[in-house]
Amino acid sequence: MCIRDSTYRCLANDVLVEKKIPVNPIWQEFFEYHTSQDYFKTVIKLFEKYMPNYKWLEQQTARIRNTQGDTKVVTDTQFVVHQPYHTTTRTTHIDNPIEFYAGLLYFRQRGDRSSGGDFMIYDSPEIKDVYKKKGREIPENISIKDHTSVPYKENTFVMFLNSNKAVHGVTPRVDASVDRLSVNIIGEYTDRSACTFRLRPID
């Protein structure tokens, strides 16, 4: 279990290996598949024409993050709970370069009458500098434009390939009184030398 500020994360290792979090068989199967070699290969195939190193990735054997094993890639699936805040907990940013894909599956709760909490995708130039202490938030002088808004809605899924143009964020929730629920599905490198882009941290 990982807790940061107002966000709680339950990792695949907690569910599948350490058995710290009891889940019903449906969720057990969900976590097993979305951290599996089959799913990893499916995602690589989906994005292959956008990945300069996809042939190398196809040859890798994935393991669950935070487990033992000699591999260059890891996968994770996470329950994520964001407590209700009137400001966004995720401004425009780029994910860690060690991540090469990410998916988000939303589970808006019945009775959630808030607005906002939508996933925003932006058009942007290639980003080189980020505020590392602010979660790789991009500088204010970078010109970005709204591209796509994915509503915070039950059973809504969005997936993206991480790059130095994959700028995204979450709109503020208004009148939020219940938690914002989602599942993250992630693929990462274990060695930063494999990353396809770099970000310079700025204060």
How would you describe each model-predicted region?
Residues 4-55:
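Non-heme Fe(II)/2-oxoglutarate
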Residues 40, 53-200:
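Catalytic core of non-heme Fe(II) oxygenases with the double-stranded beta-helix
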